Amino acid sequence: SDSTVFLLQPKPIRAKTRHAYTDWEANDYYRVSTPHFDIYTDSKPADGVKIARQVERLYSVWQQLFVEFWCDTAVLAERFNGSNKPLYARKRHQIILFSSREEYQGFFKRRTGATVNSVGFYAAEQKHSFLFVSDPPKASTWLHEVTHQLFFELGAQVPDVAAGQNIWAIEGVAMYMESFREHGHFVTVGGFESYRLQFARYRKTV
């Protein structure tokens, strides 16, 4: 992985305007921006920084694992001959990080009238990932939902993807990325550390 991503030190900035989507008032939340993400949170600044660093590392690894999904390989071939054409259309990915599960549930209750029991959610229509701070952190959920986000926003956008079939592939690859683990200046993916991946292995082998 690009070693610079391990040195990333994003700075939280107290927002000066009302947040259009959550209705958080000015000065009541923070924005943490990285090269590829904007994280908005009403939690402690350190919480925003923590997830910002993690999703940037995920982004770096995701790009390397799934290069043919997001990259124009014909342009990549031209790059080796000196071309400077962009490999893909860069986008900024939006994440809302609530300070607690109660805040998270309250947000969806106000918007939909329904009680939400999930621990994280990527909304393809709004192009936002919705997450919340917990102790211990639900890092696997962050990795899972942002993986959905990257596939949808950087690949061919298919309306209602997996609504009728192939949900196993969509959820399977997100679960695979839950196994993302950092080891100093390198990472691993696909190891036994992923709790939910063990159920898939069990069903395959037993």
Feature-to-residue mapping (PLM):
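Non-catalytic architectural context of zinc metalloproteases
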Residues: 1-139, 163
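Zinc-dependent metallopeptidase catalytic helix centered on the HExxH motif
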Residues: 126-205
